[in-house]
């Protein structure tokens, strides 16, 4: 199997979608997981104010609201968690996203003290973190907090990973990539926008430039700059359309380089890396 065939098979992106149907598919998927695992009662999600967490949060709240209505069990709850490192530059967008999704519970946990303490402890041990490595510390601290909240509310942590992100491995291993359930996987970036439009989301939340915003020295660095390829090109590639050869090569290189992120810890029986 050629590399592109393998990528398209792995990422499961349809050439065209019906936004309403995909919304229902994600909501029913989330509900089915709770129905199968009756000891689970909540979803927990970190909210940044970007497209992916806005969409995921709205879908998670819809699923939880429907579970309450269907079962009469008020223990079903959605926890939307703001996790700033100090002060977030686009805090107004996060508030707009929260107002759009109308979560049952809003929590704020500032991760700055925890991250800075880890950085200082490592420095004391002779390990000076680069700005990039510190950025990954932020992502992992955010996930640690979400799992702590989930542990106290019979919950699972919902991920925002979609296929345009998964193909490039553009997330932190065991950070924002370390979640329990990903309702957006199979969608690319433009398809996620289509779902938000269908849901009546404020336009500025899905038109803003995507950024991981993890590095102190490169605040709000656009994803497309970091990747060296645009989301339109990634989306076209995943839909089986023609893309420039250099863009295809970059996408395929990212896919190969980040293969380890799409697997749990490697065992002696794994051979994808050989």
Swiss-Prot record:
Q: In which pathway does it act?
A: Cofactor biosynthesis; NAD(+) biosynthesis; NAD(+) from deamido-NAD(+) (ammonia route): step 1/1
Residues annotated as binding ATP: 46-53, 160, 189, 211
Could you name the domain of life of the organism this protein comes from?
Answer: Bacteria
Q: Which reaction does it catalyse?
A: deamido-NAD(+) + NH4(+) + ATP = AMP + diphosphate + NAD(+) + H(+)
Name the Pfam families on file. NAD_synthase
| Ligase recorded as keyword | yes
| Annotated deamido-NAD(+) binding sites | 140, 173, 180, 260-261
Q: Name one GO biological process term.
A: NAD biosynthetic process
Q: What's a single GO CC term here?
A: cytoplasm
* Cross-referenced InterPro entries: NAD/GMP_synthase, NAD_synthase, NH(3)-dep_NAD(+)_synth, Rossmann-like_a/b/a_fold
- Give this protein's Gene Ontology molecular function annotations: ATP binding; glutaminase activity; metal ion binding; NAD+ synthase (glutamine-hydrolyzing) activity; NAD+ synthase activity
- Which enzyme class? ligase
For the ligand (Mg(2+)), the binding residues are: 52, 165
Task: Cite the entry's keywords alphabetically.
Answer: ATP-binding, Ligase, Magnesium, Metal-binding, NAD, Nucleotide-binding
Give the EC number: 6.3.1.5
Tell me, in a sentence or two, what this protein's role is. Answer: Catalyzes the ATP-dependent amidation of deamido-NAD to form NAD. Uses ammonia as a nitrogen source.
| NCBIfam families (alphabetical) | nadE (TIGR00552), PRK00768.1 (NF001979)
- Which family does the similarity line name? Belongs to the NAD synthetase family.
Describe the protein's quaternary organization and the partners it interacts with. Answer: Homodimer.
Q: Report the protein name in the record.
A: NH(3)-dependent NAD(+) synthetase
The organism is Listeria monocytogenes serotype 4a (strain HCC23)
């Amino acid at each position: 199997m050629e590399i592109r065939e393998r990528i398209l098979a792995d990422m499961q992106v349809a050439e065209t979608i019906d936004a309403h149907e995909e919304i229902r598919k994600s909501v029913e998927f989330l509900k089915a997981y709770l129905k199968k695992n009756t000891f689970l009662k909540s979803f927990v999600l970190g909210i940044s104010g970007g497209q992916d967490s806005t969409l995921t949060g709205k879908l998670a709240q819809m699923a939880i609201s429907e579970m309450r209505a269907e079962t009469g069990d008020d223990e079903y709850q959605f926890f939307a968690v703001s996790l700033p490192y100090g002060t977030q530059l686009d805090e107004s967008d996060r508030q707009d996203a929260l107002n759009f999704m109308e979560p049952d519970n809003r929590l704020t946990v500032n991760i700055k003290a925890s991250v800075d303490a880890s950085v200082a402890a490592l420095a004391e041990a002779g390990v000076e973190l680069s700005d990039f490595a510190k950025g990954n510390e932020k992502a992992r601290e955010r996930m640690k907090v979400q799992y702590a909240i989930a542990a106290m509310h019979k919950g699972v942590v919902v991920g925002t990973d979609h296929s345009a992100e998964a193909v490039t491995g553009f997330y932190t291993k065991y950070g924002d990539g370390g979640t329990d359930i990903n309702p957006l996987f199979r969608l690319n970036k433009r398809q996620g926008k289509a779902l938000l439009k269908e849901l009546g989301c404020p336009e500025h939340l899905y038109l803003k430039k995507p950024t991981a915003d993890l590095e102190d020295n490169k605040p709000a660095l656009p994803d497309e700059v970091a990747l060296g390829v645009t989301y339109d090109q990634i989306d076209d590639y995943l839909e089986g359309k023609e893309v420039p050869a250099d863009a295809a090569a970059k996408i395929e290189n990212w896919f190969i380089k980040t293969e380890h992120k799409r697997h749990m810890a490697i065992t002696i029986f794994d051979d994808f890396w050989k």
